[in-house]
A protein has these predicted regions:
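Aromatic-rich, lipid-facing transmembrane alpha helices and their immediate juxtamembrane interface loops
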Residues: 1-205
Length: 205
């Protein structure tokens, strides 16, 4: 999807990718009348919408994440397609972990959510150069992977799955509140591990 056969700026290509993925998930769930699929989609969508705040904070306040001009409009300092982009990894983590829970056990499902978060977000960070945003002024592993954000993203993936299981049958307004809590967990973890790794550990090396 990033290699579109006609000239488009990377921001528009990413918007098309995000829109296509979101419509594909929702459409499949509706056509198949897959209630748990639809519930998971909307829960991670709420989280993704709120994730604009951590991205905005990291880019505007800490200045360690850059969203350059990529041809798509911004919300603050963040490209607006990010509102739906977090759906992609979070839905994959949640759906696979749900299947593992059905086949094995809840403990193995929790472990899978942690491992999937590490793998998916780790690969995403490592391949960030393909996209339009990038980290700056932080310690990088293999030239692309920002160390400080690894644990916060694992917390994000695991807490999304864990809290979805706990509250999947609640009213939608309650799920929105829980999604906001997930965002706060991620934002707090990102802040803490940035301070710990960049200002304490790396500074003292």
């Amino acid at each position: 999807m990033l290699i579109v056969p006609f000239p488009l700026l990377i921001g528009m290509k990413l918007f098309i990718l995000v829109l296509f993925y979101n419509l594909l998930i929702l459409g499949f769930g509706v056509i198949k009348n897959h209630s748990i699929w639809i519930k998971l989609y909307f829960f991670v969508l709420f989280i993704s919408l709120f994730q604009i705040f951590p991205d905005w904070y990291l880019s505007a306040q800490l200045e360690i994440l850059v969203f350059p001009e990529d041809g798509f409009f911004k919300i603050g300092t963040v490209s607006a397609y990010m509102l739906g982009l977090w759906v992609i990894p979070l839905f994959i983590i949640g759906f696979i972990s749900l299947r593992i829970k059905e086949r094995y056990s809840i403990k193995i499902a929790y472990l899978s959510a942690i491992l999937l978060s590490l793998i998916i977000f780790g690969l995403a960070e490592q391949s960030m150069w393909v996209f339009s945003w990038y980290p700056q002024n932080v310690f990088l592993l293999f030239d692309h992977l920002a160390i400080y954000i690894i644990i916060p993203e694992i917390i994000l993936g695991f807490s999304s799955f864990y809290l979805f299981l706990k509250f999947k049958d609640n009213k939608i307004y309650f799920k929105i509140a829980i999604a906001f809590v997930v965002m706060l967990l991620y934002l707090g973890a990102a802040n803490f591990f940035y301070f710990l790794i960049e200002k304490i550990l790396v500074f003292n090396l």
